[in-house]
Amino acid sequence: LFNVLSNNYFDFEDGVTALDLFAGTGSISIELVSRGCDKVISVEKDPQHLSFISQVMREVKTDKCFPVRADAFKFIEKCSEQFDFIFDDPPYALKDLQSIPSHIFENGLLKENGLLVLEHGKDQNFEDDPHFIERRIYGSVNFSFFRATVPEAE
């Protein structure tokens, strides 16, 4: 995933700000920090996972990651910040999974030309979303990519 992002979308060392929703144990957040993101907010509801993320960030001595204990949907609704990159890895069985992209765009969480990557199972299809740009499949893992600004058809 990060090779695709680096080769096609971002130079993470170029002042990129990121949001990691449903951060779990923080592997994506850690990778974002290691690749040079200026700021990463990790949103996770589980206190043990959040504690682990905080511990790892202390061990690597970074001040670039900000773990937040919150429900991802409530965070999306209340967040007033905008990001260059949002990674979202909700539980595949989450009943509201299909609505996540629209919540993110309705609440203006992405900067202009910002990128949302949503990890999901094979049964979800986002190709009709107006912000959808591509889908990548790696075994049983699917990533749908969305842009805050969709290029106009020529």
Q: Where do the PLM segments sit?
A:
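Class I S-adenosyl-L-methionine-dependent methyltransferase catalytic core
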Residues: 2-154
